[in-house]
């Protein structure tokens, strides 16, 4: 008979895989930044915030804080490395005040996590108390991360289009939330259950919106394509007309020259 711990580990491994997919989802954005040599209007805040979330979960998973949480450490340690890579690329292609702001946020995060670690490890003397303090902070940051798609969901409702809410990422978020909620329930862990349970709710809400607005999205895309095709056709007509009647173009140029 398979033990609960074995099932929990298997679910955690799947959860690590889906979480890795989510961590890697911004790669196309950074490929664009690399090619253009500029961060344009992109913000570093999501990556700095995700880094803080990962650092706090690594602290939570330490044997001295919450034993038997190796899978929590591995995926969030990997997430830290990925987010640091994103931030390094952002810094490489940003200038002046933007770069200084990111560096300041980064320094503040490192100082905050270091202070929490020092205080918890020195002033809290049991695993239960350490887990509670760090866990509450993780719930706060984790809930904030999972609530981030609310802005996208608002845009979907306003525009009646799911064009900028990829189905694949919504499905990955759902599977990830389910895996980590199940992982936390097998050996009950309130602090992992809360943010991931909320993550499941937000992912389900995204999928419901996708089902509601899928048809209207296709109509919007088709209307845009027709408009672009009409614009191209009209441009071609104007160009052909100018070629076939060059005197009118010369007359127009002369008229413009008089004014």
Curated annotation (Swiss-Prot):
It comes from Oryza sativa subsp. japonica (Rice). GO terms for biological process: carbohydrate transport. Residues 32-44, 99-101, 153-165, 213-259 are cytoplasmic. It comes from the Eukaryota. This is Bidirectional sugar transporter SWEET4. Forms homooligomers and/or heterooligomers. The chain crosses the membrane at residues 11-31, 45-65, 78-98, 102-122, 132-152, 166-186, 192-212. GO terms for molecular function: sugar transmembrane transporter activity. The lineage of its organism: Eukaryota, Viridiplantae, Streptophyta, Embryophyta, Tracheophyta. Pfam families: MtN3_slv. GO terms for cellular component: membrane; plasma membrane. Belongs to the SWEET sugar transporter family. Gene3D superfamilies: 1.20.1280.290. Mediates both low-affinity uptake and efflux of sugar across the plasma membrane. Residues 1-10, 66-77, 123-131, 187-191 are extracellular.
């Amino acid at each position: 008979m398979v033990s609960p711990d074995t099932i929990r580990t298997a679910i955690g491994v799947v959860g690590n895989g889906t979480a890795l997919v989510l961590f890697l989802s911004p790669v196309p954005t950074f490929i664009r930044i690399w090619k253009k040599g500029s961060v344009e209007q992109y913000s570093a805040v999501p990556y700095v915030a995700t880094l803080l979330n990962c650092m706090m979960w690594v602290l939570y998973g330490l044997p001295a804080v919450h034993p038997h949480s190796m899978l929590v450490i591995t995926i969030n340690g990997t997430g830290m490395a990925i987010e640091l890579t994103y931030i390094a690329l952002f810094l490489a292609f940003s200038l002046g005040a933007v770069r200084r702001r990111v560096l300041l946020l980064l320094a503040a995060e490192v100082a905050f996590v270091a202070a929490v670690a020092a205080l918890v490890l020195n002033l809290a003397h049991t695993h239960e108390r350490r887990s509670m303090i760090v866990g509450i902070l993780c719930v706060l940051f984790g809930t904030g991360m999972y609530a981030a798609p609310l802005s996208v969901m608002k845009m979907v409702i306003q525009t009646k289009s799911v064009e900028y809410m990829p189905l694949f990422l919504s499905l990955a978020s759902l599977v990830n939330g389910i895996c980590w909620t199940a992982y936390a329930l097998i050996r009950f862990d309130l602090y992992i259950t809360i943010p991931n349970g909320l993550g499941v709710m937000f992912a389900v809400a995204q999928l419901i919106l996708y089902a509601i607005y899928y048809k209207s999205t296709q109509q919007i895309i088709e209307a845009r394509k027709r408009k672009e095709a009409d614009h191209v056709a009209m441009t071609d007509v104007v160009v052909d007309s100018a070629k076939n009647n060059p005197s009118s173009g010369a007359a127009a140029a002369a008229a413009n020259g008089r004014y």
